[in-house]
Design a protein with these regions (language model features):
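Phosphate-group recognition and catalysis centered on beta-loop-alpha active-site segments
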Residues: 1-240
Length: 240
């Protein structure tokens, strides 16, 4: 089965991450999906932006015009991203914080069919809410939380996340590639959870994971490299 290749925040080696230009380039480079982050502004707009704050001011406390002014960028709204990508590529939409799960999914469903996007998050509760209200939406738990308050407890819950996954009824898991140890992939297979690994940028690792039948897909900043390696791998397998 062909691995799914997901452009991490668009083609960010060509254009600034999470911009319309980066997303357009990812489409042209034949990515299968685009991954991006969604937050809500003070004036209730959904914007595509990774960081929690700008100049120490939380995104949730800023209006849209201020965000663009502070970043010196045309930060895209979710509406703009969907209009650009609709019918051209599927979306991997990461919800960054709690409190607007139902609103954002309802908004997305105004434009997209249920099979045209997935929702991912580090936050168990957000995914639980979405699955309860929208059972047909595919959800995925992201593992590999940066700078956790309790590193040991957090890492153990990420290396052995399957009880969490059952509780919130996710469809797949998205571990950081460094978590693929101590039998992680074997356990995921036992629990019948597809694995989408992030963020895989080294050519050696991309090749390794493309060849691993236990991995369903890769999230990468190097989408052009990954697409080419996948094509080469498929040609190799067609040779007599």
């Amino acid at each position: 089965m062909k691995k799914v290749l997901i452009a991490h925040r668009g083609a960010r080696t060509y254009f600034h991450e999470n911009t319309l230009e980066a997303f357009e380039k990812a489409i042209r480079l034949n990515a299968d999906m685009i991954e991006f982050d969604v937050r809500r502004t003070q004036n209730n707009l959904f914007v595509v932006y990774h960081d929690e704050s700008i100049a120490e001011k939380p995104i949730k406390d800023l209006v849209y015009d201020d965000i663009c002014q502070f970043t010196q960028l045309k930060v895209p709204t979710l509406d703009e991203v969907i209009k650009l990508t609709r019918g051209r590529i599927k979306l991997d939409i990461e919800i960054k914080e709690e409190g607007y799960e139902q609103e954002v999914v309802k908004f997305i469903l105004e434009f997209l069919k249920e099979d045209e996007f997935v929702i991912t998050s580090f936050n168990d509760n957000s995914l639980k809410i979405i699955k309860e209200v929208f059972p047909k939406i595919r959800t995925g738990l992201i593992l590999g939380k940066p700078n956790p308050k309790n590193p040991f407890r957090t890492r153990m819950s990420e290396l052995f996340p399957f009880k969490r996954c059952r509780k919130i009824n996710v469809d797949f898991i998205a571990p950081h590639w460094r978590l693929l140890k101590l039998g992680f992939l074997r356990r995921a297979g036992k629990h019948k959870l597809p694995v989408f690994v992030w963020t895989v940028n080294e050519t050696k690792l991309i090749t390794k994971f493309l060849r691993d039948t236990r991995i369903a897909g890769l999230v990468t900043d190097k989408i052009e490299t990954a697409v080419q390696l996948r094509e080469n791998f498929q040609v190799d397998h067609l040779l007599p």
